[in-house]
Amino acid sequence: MNEMLKEELLQSIREVKDYPKKGILFKDITTLLNYPKLFNKLIDALKKRYLALNIDFIVGIEARGFILGSAFAYALGVGFVPVRKKGKLPAHTLSQSYSLEYGSDSIEIHSDAFRGIKGVRVVLVDDLLATGGTALASLELIKALQAECIEACFLIGLKELPGIQLLEEHVKTFCLLEC
């Protein structure tokens, strides 16, 4: 990815202090979405990175991973699979719990998400990688469906948190922007 695109992306992402709680500097990608030409450049850059890898599906993590992932899947001409919070998917699901700072949560994927095909090649997508808990749980769901995660792809990776290092122990990880 070229440095000019990275700088444009950084400039388009709003930072919100003390959200969702005091001490957090939230990276809000919704402002990036207001710039269609820049968003197209982002999706084109991701397409270029993954086009030759014979990807079958993009797996997007709720909720902003849906925005990036569905546009990315469309650009590649592949299917999109959502990973959602527990109780949000209507058909039979597989569930995976993960730890939060104060407790735990669960995410789910439809058990037929990859149309019952084993060995499909997927890229896991989300807007931001912080601690890695949700991404690791998503990887477990992908593995449970006997799919191969080629890479986990994030718009932003937070260097001061353990997510990048933790995730790289399990899957090749790409963060377009490391902040």
UniProtKB/Swiss-Prot annotation:
Main location: cytoplasm
Location in or out of the cell: Cytoplasm
One GO cellular component term: cytoplasm
Enzyme kind, highest EC tier: transferase
Short name of any one Pfam family annotated for the protein: Pribosyltran
Listed CDD domains: PRTases_typeI (cd06223)
Catalysed reactions, semicolon-separated: AMP + diphosphate = 5-phospho-alpha-D-ribose 1-diphosphate + adenine
SUPFAM superfamilies assigned: PRTase-like (SSF53271)
Pathway: Purine metabolism; AMP biosynthesis via salvage pathway; AMP from adenine: step 1/1
Signal peptide: none
Family (UniProt): Belongs to the purine/pyrimidine phosphoribosyltransferase family.
PANTHER family, per the entry: ADENINE PHOSPHORIBOSYLTRANSFERASE
Name of the molecule in the record: Adenine phosphoribosyltransferase
Origin species: Helicobacter pylori (strain J99 / ATCC 700824) (Campylobacter pylori J99)
